[in-house]
């Protein structure tokens, strides 16, 4: 590297840094130094005890090539069509544009060492960690020639997940839970089934104390920008605590200090350092650490443009960059210098990429790289392999019933605390029921009253449908990323999630229809009698649950909330048209007849009208106008609409639709999790 490049980097660093590195190095009372040198780490006693790890893992990888699809923007409808094509069509033979993200990367992480992956934004740090943790996103492909080994034994995703904890950069939580409730759920499904619930709760208390979460343990996590809750630093510590519950032998952390102040960043890295000293293998990415934090790293891996620019100790890094003519200036933070040397400078892209290519080429043929290759061959030749026991070979830590119980508990608490699901919906239901009741108040048994009652009954169905579909889409799509991550981490099965969530939300979907019918039914003056009331209540309750199931299906088939909200109404309208109000059931075209059997509007509207008019005898309906058709009895009113008196058939139809939509939603979510694996 030329003198001009070095001067340019130094000037850039001076512009970005308000306080000189020299003053930081000469001031022993800096925040990071105080965190490291003080007794702060003593509060982590139980988490970082001196006990040796049960299993020590050397993680090595070689010839790692990662390719990603080039994103092609499109509308929500186009994305939905592509998803449907992906489900029913074999896309393997359709060539897609790809980008080479990680290029022939090799490396090794030893037990007892803290390996820090550094590089500028876009260097490939997160992509590398996702590949190492077998958590690559959809559309990202790992080359078949890539080798990933633990103790010289090639591993797959299941073996890695049994031994590795992965703290990802973005924190995903159920925002309505408290920090303690979240950790209780995580401990229940993460920790071995041989442990009692009391032991798991003791571990939760221990981790809460270790990571300084005592003050915020009963604070709701919240949703950034929507519901106030934990701070960014507290959320990051909570994510770390979730993974620390099981005390894993291999820990991979993507930007664990992101969003933390300097004191907490230093404390978190100190904890990771202590974990590595216990014999654990720790890999983390970090963006431009302070000089104090940089000294904690046993090894550093510098990434640039998807390639390895250096892998070795900090001392070896100084020698390497000095050898290639890029010596770090005196009193300059080495981490800042390396990142800036390997960054693509705006306006100097060609020159920067040429410099990066030369650095990576020099490392590939250098002494450190050759020694690493020899060590890799020695590791691959080992025969000790991996320990095999029940805890590492079992797919899920918790039993099926434990998973189901934990999910049902979490879903029930979340439902009670979610304002959109409880308070707002109850108020909305009451207001709409009162409004409809006032508009159609005490309808008389006349030909006009018959028309009004029929319209009011159909309003029951449209209100229940759209209220539940949109409520589910708004809440469930926000929870889907959490579901996807937790199922990929093998915390629970897809079927236990769906069953537990369904049963937890069932009381709400029983209360809302009851509240609505209890208000609107008597105000309108519908057919009196407890039997008629309960029949109407049963039908409206089933409609609420069918529409909820349909909302689950849309949510599971959509990639985002905006997409689900865009496609939800157009998909609902066809079912509404077959309800018998806009189109007589006897006039449905033959080619659409099959679709009418999936319309819950049809079954419910027919059932409610049969319940209302089937036993109305001739003479009960008063004809007050000679200019309009007047049904002489309830049977005539039903025949006009082409309805048959088969009430139980409508009930069975709605129950069947609930099962169909729930199963379809489960299959959609299951296929998404399969594609992610």
Curated annotation (Swiss-Prot):
Domain ABC transporter: 82-330
TM region(s), chain numbering: 431-451, 456-476, 506-526, 534-554, 563-583, 647-667
UniProt-recorded Gene Ontology molecular function terms: ABC-type transporter activity; ATP binding; ATP hydrolysis activity; pigment binding
InterPro entries, per the entry: AAA+_ATPase, ABC2_TM, ABC_transporter-like_ATP-bd, ABC_transporter-like_CS, ABCG_dom, ABCG_transporters, P-loop_NTPase, Pigment_permease/Abcg
GO CC annotation: cytoplasmic vesicle membrane; plasma membrane
UniProt xrefs under Pfam families: ABC2_membrane, ABC2_membrane_7, ABC_tran
Keywords: ATP-binding, Membrane, Nucleotide-binding, Pigment, Transmembrane, Transmembrane helix, Transport
Binding site for ATP: 119-126
Protein localization: Membrane
SUPFAM superfamilies the record matches: P-loop containing nucleoside triphosphate hydrolases
Membrane topology listed for this record: Multi-pass membrane protein
Function text: May be part of a membrane-spanning permease system necessary for the transport of pigment precursors into pigment cells responsible for eye color.
Xref: NCBIfam families: 3a01204
Assigned protein family: Belongs to the ABC transporter superfamily. ABCG family. Eye pigment precursor importer (TC 3.A.1.204) subfamily.
Name used for this protein in its record: Protein white
Annotated organism of origin: Lucilia cuprina
The encoding gene: W
């Amino acid at each position: 590297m030329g003198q001009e490049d070095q001067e340019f980097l130094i000037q850039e660093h001076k512009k970005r840094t308000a306080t000189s590195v020299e003053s930081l190095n000469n001031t022993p009372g800096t925040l990071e130094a105080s965190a490291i040198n003080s007794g702060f780490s003593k509060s982590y006693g139980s988490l970082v005890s001196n006990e040796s790890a049960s299993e020590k893992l050397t993680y090595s990888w070689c010839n790692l090539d990662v390719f990603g699809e080039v994103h092609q923007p499109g509308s929500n409808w186009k994305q939905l069509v592509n998803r449907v094509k992906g489900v029913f069509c074999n896309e393997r033979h359709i060539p897609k544009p790809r980008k080479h993200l990680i290029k022939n990367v090799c490396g090794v992480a030893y037990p007892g060492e803290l390996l820090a992956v550094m590089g500028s934004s876009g260097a490939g740090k997160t992509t590398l960690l996702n590949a190492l943790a077998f958590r690559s996103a959809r559309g990202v492909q790992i080359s078949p020639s890539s080798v990933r080994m633990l103790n010289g034994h090639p591993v797959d995703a299941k073996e890695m997940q049994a031994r590795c904890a992965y703290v990802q950069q973005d924190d995903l939580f159920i925002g309505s839970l408290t920090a303690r409730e979240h950790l209780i759920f995580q401990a229940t499904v993460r920790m071995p089934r041989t442990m009692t619930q009391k032991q798991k709760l003791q571990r939760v208390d221990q981790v809460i104390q270790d990571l300084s979460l005592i003050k915020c343990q009963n604070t709701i996590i919240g949703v950034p920008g929507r519901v106030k809750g934990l701070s960014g630093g507290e959320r990051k510590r909570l994510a770390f605590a979730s993974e620390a519950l099981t005390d894993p032998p291999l820990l991979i952390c993507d930007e664990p200090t992101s969003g933390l102040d300097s004191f907490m960043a230093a404390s978190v890295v100190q904890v990771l350092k202590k974990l590595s000293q216990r014999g654990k293998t720790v890999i983390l990415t970090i963006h431009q650490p302070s000089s104090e934090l940089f000294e904690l790293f046993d090894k550093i891996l510098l990434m640039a443009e998807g390639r390895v620019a250096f892998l070795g100790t900090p001392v070896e890094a100084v020698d390497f960059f000095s050898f290639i003519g890029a010596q770090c200036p005196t009193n300059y933070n080495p981490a800042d210098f390396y990142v800036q040397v390997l960054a693509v400078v705006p306006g100097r892209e060609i020159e920067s990429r040429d410099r990066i290519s030369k650095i990576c080429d020099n490392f590939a043929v250098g002494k450190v790289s050759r020694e690493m290759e020899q060590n890799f061959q020695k590791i691959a030749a080992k025969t000790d392999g991996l320990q095999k026991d029940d805890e590492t070979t079992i797919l899920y830590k918790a039993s099926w019933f434990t998973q189901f119980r934990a999910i049902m508990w979490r879903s029930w608490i979340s439902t009670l605390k979610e304002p959109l699901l409880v308070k707002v919906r109850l108020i909305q239901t009451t207001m709409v029921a009162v409004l409809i009741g006032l508009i159609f108040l005490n309808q008389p048994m006349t030909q006009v009253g018959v028309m009004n009652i029929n319209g009011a009954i159909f309003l029951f169905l449209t209100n229940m449908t759209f209220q539940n579909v949109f409520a589910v889409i708004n809440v469930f799509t926000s929870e889907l990323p959490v579901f996807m991550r937790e199922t990929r981490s093998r915390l629970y099965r897809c079927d236990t999630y769906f069953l537990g969530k369904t049963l937890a939300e069932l009381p709400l979907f029983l209360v809302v229809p009851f509240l609505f019918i209890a208000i609107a039914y008597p105000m309108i003056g519908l057919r009196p009698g407890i039997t008629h009331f309960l029949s109407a209540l049963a039908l409206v309750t089933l409609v609420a649950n069918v529409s909820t199931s349909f909302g689950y299906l849309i949510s599971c088939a959509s990639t985002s909330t905006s997409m689900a909200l865009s496609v939800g109404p157009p998909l609902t309208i066809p079912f509404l048209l077959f309800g018998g109000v806009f189109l007589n059931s006897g006039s449905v075209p033959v080619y659409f007849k099959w679709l009418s059997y999936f319309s819950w509007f049809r079954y419910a509207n027919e059932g409610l009208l049969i319940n209302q008019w089937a036993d109305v005898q001739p003479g009960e309906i008063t004809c007050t106008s000679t200019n309009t058709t007047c049904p002489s009895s309830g049977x005539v009113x039903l025949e006009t609409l082409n309805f048959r008196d088969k009430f139980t058939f409508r009930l069975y139809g709605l129950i069947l639709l609930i099962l169909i939509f729930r199963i379809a939603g489960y299959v959609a979510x299951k296929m998404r999790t399969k594609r992610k694996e």
